């Protein structure tokens, strides 16, 4: 990796949740939010680029779904250093199974596992080489 920060994309239709995530994540050293999307179309456009390392993906979006986003990403783009975190209020087993089958690395319930997103991203950010060496 040539960059010195873990680059995050937030895919969430709720402005309140986006703000809460942004506030929580910006406290993590070596992490920056490089993009945000509210719809499936916006998310796919961002995630087809190469300017991200991890994405937080809601299942229910303003237009479209997180499952649609996962389906639209080519398997070839799912390289090992990219992490997809599904973060949803719809944490049903069938959604988890489908999300993981489509390439999600993690699946968390917004109402009970908000802290887990931060834990995962903190660990990933700690692995990013710093600019000083």
Question: Each PLM stretch: what is its role?
Answer:
Residues 67-80:
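Short amphipathic alpha-helix used as the core "switch/output" element in two-component signaling
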Residues 58-59:
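Active-site residues of response regulator receiver
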Residues 1-7, 115-133:
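Non-catalytic signal-transmission and effector/linker regions of two-component phosphorelay proteins
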Residues 36-54:
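Acidic, metal-coordinating helix/loop segments flanking the phosphotransfer/catalytic sites
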Residues 15-35:
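Two-component/phosphorelay signaling modules centered on CheY-like receiver
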């Amino acid at each position: 990796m040539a960059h010195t920060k873990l680059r995050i994309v937030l895919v969430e239709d709720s402005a309140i949740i986006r703000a809460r995530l942004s506030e929580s994540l910006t406290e993590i050293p070596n992490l920056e939010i490089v993009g945000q999307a509210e719809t499936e179309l916006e998310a796919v456009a961002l995630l087809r680029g190469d300017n991200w390392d991890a994405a937080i993906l809601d299942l229910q979006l303003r237009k479209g779904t997180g499952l649609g986003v996962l389906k639209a990403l080519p398997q070839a783009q799912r390289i090992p250093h990219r992490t997809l975190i599904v973060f949803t209020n719809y944490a049903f087993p069938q959604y988890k199974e489908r999300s993981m089958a489509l390439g999600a690395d993690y699946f968390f319930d917004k109402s009970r596992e908000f802290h887990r997103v931060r834990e995962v991203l903190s660990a990933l950010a700690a692995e990013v080489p710093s600019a000083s060496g």
